[in-house]
């Protein structure tokens, strides 16, 4: 997933 780019966005 793109947790590195936007961890808060996914969560």
UniProtKB/Swiss-Prot annotation:
Entry superkingdom: Eukaryota
Protein name per the record: Unknown protein 1
Provenance organism: Capsicum annuum var. annuum (Red pepper)
């Amino acid at each position: 997933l793109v947790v590195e780019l936007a961890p808060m966005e996914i969560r």
